[in-house]
Amino acid sequence: MEITKIELDQKETLDEVFKIYQNSFPANERQTLETLKIRLKEEKEVLFAAKINNEMVGIGFLFDLLGSDFLLLDYLAVKQNHRGKQIGEALFSHLKNYARLQEKHLLMEVDDPEFGDDKPYRVKRLAFYQKNGAFWLKDIKYILPALDGTNPTEQILMLVPKNSKSEFSGEEIKDLVKRLYAELYGISGEDTNLANINSSITEKVVVLPFL
């Protein structure tokens, strides 16, 4: 398996990436393809792809919260007929190494298993991240805005900390969430979801296993 960084001018490869992307995520969690292309052009987003025998089998998007200590794992997906082959683990390991070289925490927005009608899938995804070195930012009730104008998604925040950091100040996490909402979702100022998230952030936020 080969994992490489994909550039905006690789049109045929991008078409393959976007096909996996659209088949892997629900509409309320997907940015438009045009938005992703703009982010790649402006170097706010970094894209990696995994190939086996020249076939695209997995993708990983990282969003750089410039000027902060965080990289967001925006999207990670494996082509449906190639799941269960350790491709996700290999991609995630590659992304962790990239974050380490950038000297940044690798952050994830992960669906909360206490909500939704697909709990087994949510638990499986959360367990995947935990098994591969990610920890939970304790008790934060994160909400992903609906990207298609329908319903928001209840989530938790996880991360692979740099330098084994085990605690953050509440103000640092509030600033992080504010930046996520502004830079990824175009939401700033007063917002009900943002206010609800902030109300769940304590003075000190510890990093723990979730399961």
Where are these regions (language model features)?
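Short amphipathic alpha-helix that is part of the acyltransferase structural core
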Residues: 1-35, 177-187
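A conserved beta-strand-loop-helix scaffold within acyl/acetyltransferase catalytic domains
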Residues: 18, 22-77
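A structural signal for short, well-ordered beta-strand segments and their strand-loop junctions
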Residues: 49, 72, 106-109, 136-139
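Conserved acetyl-CoA-binding loop-helix of GNAT-fold acetyltransferases
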Residues: 78, 84-99
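Conserved active-site alpha-helix within GNAT-family acetyltransferase domains
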Residues: 113-138
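C-terminal "cap" of GNAT-fold acetyltransferases
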Residues: 121, 142-193
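Long hydrophobic alpha-helical segments typical of transmembrane helices together
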Residues: 183-211
